[in-house]
Amino acid sequence: MRMIPELPEAVPAEPVVPSPALPGPHAVAWARRRRAMAEIWLAFRRNRQAMVGLVILVAIAAMALLAPVLANEEALRAVNTVDNPPWASPSREFLFGTDNLGRSVAVQFVFGARISLLVGLFATVLTIVIGTLVGVVAGFFGGWTESALMRLTDWFLVIPFLPLAIVLARILGPSVWSIIFVIGITTWPYVSRLVRAQVLTVKQRLYVERARAMGASRWHVVRRHILPNVGPVILANTTLTVPIAILTETTLAFLGLGDPTRASWGKTLQEAYDAGAITRNAWWYYLPAGIGIVVVVLAFTMVGRALEEILDPRLRERR
């Protein structure tokens, strides 16, 4: 009898495990940016000068934010300080002494930090926005657009900065927002020149040319390729623009063009000078505000120079 060969047992098929999906281009781009930011922060932390400046700025910003908790704003009004001794030197009751009206200089210092930082930061934002917009449009589009915008920029650069700011502040009137507008509208040309030079370099790179050849729109090229590469320059320039804005606010307030209803470090210096604090040797009146301005400007400069060095390989090589 013929034997029928046995068929081999069927081996169950292994389940097919789908391979993990590859990340899209947007995810890859964001991952690269996060990695780059992590590297920048690591280099920033290793820079002792940058960390000292950052700690100072955080401390002063915390003091400004907590001003209503640390001091009573009503003490800034002379009608509430008639019982305080005028020209009192620093003591346990009045940490920084009092002014000619009996107001606490420490309260003026704490609340003055809020206005000085507010003006410095908001004016810097306005400066960076206008300067970046003009620089990107001029550098990317070129032609008559670039020519017109650069002539406008040159016009602002030719006119002396401080006299123009004084005239505009006088026309607009004394207020915090007028000072912010004046500083922003007179300092953006320096940013636009820097951004335009960076855009002219970036738009000649191969990946930008390839994106154009593939039919990418101008807005896509600017948003995906130009701005991310100009960003580090803008970031470093921002930290260096804030001290300029603070010094400008101090100058305008000292000249009597600031908001008379708000305490600021510049206004404190102006009132101390008008009250004769220098001739009376009342150093406690003007010294805290002066030291505060110097420390904040120095701290922002330290952070800005460190960022500039981290983001610019040429500066790292020189060091």
Whereabouts are the PLM-identified features?
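Glycine-rich helix-loop "coupling/hinge" segments at transmembrane-helix boundaries
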Residues: 157, 168-171, 183, 198-199, ...
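Gly/Trp-centered helix-boundary motif
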Residues: 1-132, 136-137, 144, 272-303, ...
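Amphipathic alpha-helical segments that mediate coupling or scaffolding at interfaces
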Residues: 43-44, 109-112, 116, 137, ...
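Generic hydrophobic transmembrane alpha-helix motif, especially the helices
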Residues: 95, 99, 105, 126-205, ...
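Transmembrane alpha-helices
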Residues: 114-130, 219-251, 300
